[in-house]
Design a protein with these regions (language model features):
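N-terminal glycine-rich FAD/FM-binding segment characteristic of electron-transfer flavoproteins
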Residues: 1-193
Length: 193
């Protein structure tokens, strides 16, 4: 089992990534939604936004992502990736993450994302927050969101450090209309949204 020290974590500054899910050469709508959300996060961090797209004969659909705000796309095209397999996709994504080192990675809360996200997080020894309904980096904006939409005590909200660059996430709590803030250890931050 590997562990990361602060120097290792500092190396993970390769932008915000979105796992772009496709099936039989058709991009899933969740991918476009996450590209849009990822664009906001990348802008807040002052970094680039990249999609990561796996499959076979997918070069054509990779071009679609630029129109939705991606600065680039990592395309992993191989016959063995034509259909989703847990082990294959996990290996390719984790190997690519370790090579290019994104700061944040978003994965859709689809059937594939719910299978893939936890496996990648475990293999990369990082945190994962599922079913996110709000993502933010900008601390003042996030505090305002929490004040307006959560039942947290103001002292808890005010206790969030202003210099915190980590991804802030909000997810449903207790199966009802309430929500709870969440955070994961630094790098790479995975959030099925």
């Amino acid at each position: 089992m590997s562990t990361f020290n602060s120097a290792d974590i500092a190396a993970f500054n390769g932008g915000v990534w979105v796992f772009c899910e496709q099936r039989q050469g058709t991009m899933m709508p969740t991918s476009f939604e996450l590209i849009s959300e990822g664009r906001k996060l990348a802008d807040e961090l002052g970094t680039k936004l990249y999609g990561i797209l796996l499959g076979h004969n997918i070069e054509g659909i990779a071009k679609e992502l630029g129109g939705y705000g991606a600065d680039g796309v990592y395309v992993c095209d191989h016959p063995l990736l034509e259909n989703y397999t847990t082990d294959g996709y996990t290996k390719v994504i984790c190997d690519t993450v370790m090579e290019y080192k994104p700061e944040v990675m978003l994965i859709g809360a689809t059937n594939i994302g719910r299978d893939l996200g936890p496996r990648c997080a475990a293999r990369l020894h990082t945190g994962l927050c599922a079913d996110c309904t709000h993502l933010d980096i900008d601390v003042p904006k996030y505090k305002q969101f929490l004040r307006e939409s959560s039942t947290l005590a103001p002292a808890m909200i005010d206790g969030i450090p202003e210099e915190d660059r980590n991804l802030k996430m909000t997810r449903p709590a207790f199966g009802g209309p309430s929500s709870a803030p969440a955070s994961v250890p630094p790098w790479p931050l995975c959030a099925p949204a």
